A protein has these predicted regions:
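Charged, solvent-exposed interaction patches on well-folded alpha/beta domains
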Residues: 1-3, 10-18, 24-224
Length: 224
């Protein structure tokens, strides 16, 4: 094998950190003949659909990417590399939509003030009083200055770009009020500090329940 003393550890670290799923690498030489490498992986918290340049070909193709908390884009891992619990978690991650001109490069950050706020919202939601009560489905960035969150429970919640802790607590208060009155929130605008506009979901007559399955997302690349 290669002489361990001649190995450029900094180059080894740089080469490994070029991999999109790797956040940080620590490389240590342990004489007489051991190389220790510690790897920290990026944790996906959201998904986004965008155009990736076609490798070696002109044009782009439509692809689903994962985003970590800093907005680094990663292609989905192969199914054989993912445990069943982690695969189920990835399938529940919310989508970020409404990003104009979405050209995405693997390993690069998707950067904007709204994107940073959207990823912060997703992170803070997991620690909020609403976690476990509703499931985030989409975080829409198409309106300037706000984030519009759609849940799988058919709620549509508008957030300001900061102060998520206060807004989440306000959401919980209104959620609990709706439960006490036998209602569900349809729309709620938390981006305003006073007189929060809210609308209830229409009450539907009871009908026999039917199992509804959510279609699985196909992460395979689609050419357009």
């Amino acid at each position: 094998g290669e002489n361990l003393l001649a190995l450029d550890l900094a180059q080894v670290q740089r080469d490994l950190e070029l991999q999109p799923w790797i956040e940080h690498v620590a490389v240590e030489r342990l004489l007489p003949g051991t190389l220790r490498i510690r790897v920290s992986e990026r944790k996906p918290i959201a998904r986004i659909v965008g155009f990736e340049p076609s490798g070696g070909k002109a044009g782009f193709h439509l692809t689903t990417f994962f985003l970590d908390r800093e907005g680094h884009a990663m292609l989905p891992p192969k199914n054989s590399h993912v445990s069943a619990p982690e695969g189920a978690r990835l399938d529940r991650l919310p989508y970020v939509s409404g990003v104009s001109g979405t050209e995405i490069r693997t390993g690069r950050r998707v950067k904007s003030l709204q994107m940073d706020s959207a990823l912060q919202l997703v992170e803070e939601f997991a620690r909020s009083p609403m976690s476990g009560l509703v499931d985030l489905d989409v975080v829409d960035l198409s309106l300037p200055g706000v984030l519009v969150v759609k849940t799988r429970q058919k709620n549509e919640i508008t957030f300001a770009l900061d102060g998520f802790d206060r807004q989440m607590r306000h959401w919980r208060l209104i959620h609990d009020l709706a439960l006490r009155e036998g209602r569900q929130v349809a729309t709620l605008d938390l981006s305003v500090s006073n007189n929060v506009p809210a609308r209830w979901q229409e009450q539907e007559p009871e009908r026999p329940s039917a199992a509804v399955s959510r279609p699985a997302v196909d992460y395979r690349r689609k050419h357009v």
